[in-house]
Amino acid sequence: MGNRAVITIKEKNIPQEDWQSLYLHWNGGRDTVEPLLHVAKLYGVRCQDDPSYAIARLSQIVGNFIQGTTSLGVGTYKQLDTDNADNGVYVVKDWEIVDREYHHGLEQQEYDFNEMVSEIRSKNDQVFGYEEQD
């Protein structure tokens, strides 16, 4: 039981099974994933230039947000629970969702995008040294 998802970064000239990926046991709904990706982009985290770095920083953002010591996994696409019976896989390019796999249900729409961004930032701005520009 969970609200599982995998976020994978689409990589050029690399087989999909080897794409850098992040497993979420909780908070895998699109209404949380899109704000997480937005915050990564806001912080200037490089996505396509170095996908392993991108996944590491995204996992830091997620970990700071959900807290605790469980519920995250990092690996390649083939290593993670992609057909997880919850939210499936979000295929990401430049921090935008460009494809979706193994999602068969209704889209979760419980959280407001801007409120979620604010909540994620409240746990990460200081860590990432981010200040809003006027």
Language model: regions and residue ranges:
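Short, surface-exposed coil-to-beta transition loops
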Residues: 1-5, 18-19, 84-86
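Extracellular/luminal recognition modules and glycoprotein regions
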Residues: 3, 28-37, 48
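Short, solvent-exposed aromatic-acidic interface loops
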Residues: 18-32
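Low-complexity intrinsically disordered segments
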Residues: 39-134
